[in-house]
Amino acid sequence: PVYTQAYTYRAITRSRLGNYDDALQDFREAIDLRPDLPGPYYSRGVTRLLNQQFKEAIDDFDKFIRQENKVADAFICRGLSYLHLKDTTRAYENFNTAIRTNRENPNGYNRRGGLHLQQEQYKEAEADFNKAIECDSAYLLSYFNRALVYNATNRPMQALADFDKVIQLDSTNSLTYFN
């Protein structure tokens, strides 16, 4: 078991450094040692998502979810993988499942809101961003995204207030200054 953890954590570290090939090799080693453990599948799925191997990422998230179906982030990551493959229906289903799994996780609402925003469903997007902010008042990405909704729906003063909030929360966010 210690070797499995060592391979897994080394893989996660390599993935964070952008060394995806070596990370994936370490995940293979960990999974070969203990294919019954769900964690390496999730972490390898994240690495594959970051490395734009979306179909393979979905396969890993499927394996993880079969063993651990109460982790909202797994559904969010699988939803993002589907979104990158332009399968908005499955992305939406996964974001909904993530929200049902953990109603206090702002990321599920933010991701679903982002999908609504992309589809110009502004009322639904705004409701999701509001809910994400209700879950975590410091979740700056939802303020930023809600400001985009306000801009798209001709509410510039509300957009400015949200962009100001993003700057207050993270003064290094250059996208806020650009928008």
Q: What is the role of each PLM region?
A:
Residues P1-N179:
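Alpha-helical tetratricopeptide repeat
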